Curated annotation (Swiss-Prot):
Keywords carried by this UniProt record: ATP-binding, Kinase, Lipid A biosynthesis, Lipid biosynthesis, Lipid metabolism, Nucleotide-binding, Transferase
Name recorded for this polypeptide: Tetraacyldisaccharide 4'-kinase
Recorded family membership: Belongs to the LpxK family.
HAMAP family, A to Z: LpxK
EC number(s) from the headed UniProt entry: 2.7.1.130
Amino acid sequence: MPFWYRPVTWAWLLLPLALLFKMISFCRRLAYQKGFFKRYKSKLPVIIVGNISVGGNGKTPFVIWLCEMLITVGYKPAVISRGYGGKSNHYPLLVGDHIKGHEAGDEPVLIHKRLGIPVVVDPNRKNAVKYIEQHFLADIIISDDGLQHYALQRDIEIVIVDGKRRFGNQHLMPIGPLRENLSRLNSVDFVVNNGGQQVNEITMLLKAQNCQRVDGETAQLSSGVQVNACAAIGYPQRFFDTLNQQQFEILKAVGFNDHHAFSKDDFTQFEASIPLLMTEKDAVKCTDFAQPNWWYLPVSAEFSAGFEQQLLNRIKEIKC
């Protein structure tokens, strides 16, 4: 919500709802911690990559980097996801080349496309973990989001923070964007700052790669040309800022709701002769009707020195 990131007096009308949300969240987490609710403990190490605020903070690029790094050093990771924005007629859903974004959600489809590793979607993450344990030789599980899914025990918690917007007005939903109190950051293993620098936080930078055609054809798009742009992510302006940094001249920029299910009609507002740029996450939802002049901008995550080894050391502690 825009008012989460700028002062508005009427937001305090939502205070009773925020207090109710706080009470429910606290009691729910406490119930799992004290054993009143059952938690599933996997035989494999589980790493949660999540956030304490609503909206896109950069979890998916981090998950992709993490899995690539683990593969490089010899691990066999698998990814689980709730599949937000998708709806399947059965779960657990194993993401494959034939699975579309409207079934699995855009992030799981993107992760599978980039990595080719097992990606399993289930609103109940415990069932996704069990599916991986039964059907794959994975030796570590990465949960894309799920910090607040306390029914699943975890070994490492990593929180991604938006380095520009941070935590908005620092209030709990619905007054603010927080899913949990800021004090929750004190109990996680790593806090990763996407695009900013803060003491005791790991700096993550998203580096833009060469633009790719959405339809999969091989071609090149030079930076500096005039383009239109669209983004259906938590913070579209971040993507538009990235395009500006790549020297693209944006003629028209349109932000859609996060996880928007694209159709052909969404693109009639753009001049067909002008290249259209979108995020890689959005591109996986548009392949069936992509035009030759549609492009996406892949990004890769880079980190401050020493973080990779810190994380590997923490994983080794679990496996000992």
